[in-house]
Amino acid sequence: MAHKKAGGSSRNGRDSKGQRLGCKKFGGETVKAGNIIYRQRGTQIHPGNNVGCGKDYTLFALIEGIVTFERMGRDRKKVSVYPN
C-alpha cells in the first residue's frame, strides 16, 4: 500500500460561476420599455403595473417610466413602472 497519493490529482478544484441575479434597476430610476428590472429564481418580487414577467421570472418594463417598489400586504413585494 502506498502512503503517498499520486502527484497531480486534486479533488477540490471546481466552482460554479455566479448567476448575476438581483436588482438591475432600483426605485426612482428611469427605464425604457424592455429594460430588465429584476432577475430572480421564483417570484421573490411580483410584477406590478406596467411590468412583465419572463419564463425565468425576470421582471422587465413594459413602458417607459420610473421604477417603484411597493408592498403587497405584509409579506409580498411588487415592482411597478409609472409614466413620468
UniProtKB/Swiss-Prot annotation:
Query: What PROSITE patterns is this protein classified in?
Result: RIBOSOMAL_L27
Q: Is Ribosomal protein tagged as a keyword? A: yes
Keyword Ribosomal protein attributed: yes
From the UniProt entry, list the residue stretches annotated as the region Disordered: 1-24
Q: Which UniProt keywords apply?
A: Ribonucleoprotein, Ribosomal protein
Q: Do you know which Gene3D superfamilies this protein is assigned to?
A: 2.40.50.100
Question: What GO cellular component entries does it have?
Answer: cytosolic large ribosomal subunit
- Which GO annotations describe the biological process of this protein? translation
What is a GO molecular function of this protein?
structural constituent of ribosome
UniProt cross-references to Pfam families, sorted A to Z: Ribosomal_L27 (PF01016)
InterPro entries this protein is in? Ribosomal_bL27, Ribosomal_bL27_CS
Signal sequence extent: none
Which NCBIfam families does the entry link to?
Answer: L27 (TIGR00062)
Entry's family note: Belongs to the bacterial ribosomal protein bL27 family.
Q: What is this protein called?
A: Large ribosomal subunit protein bL27
Give the originating organism.
Pelobacter propionicus (strain DSM 2379 / NBRC 103807 / OttBd1)
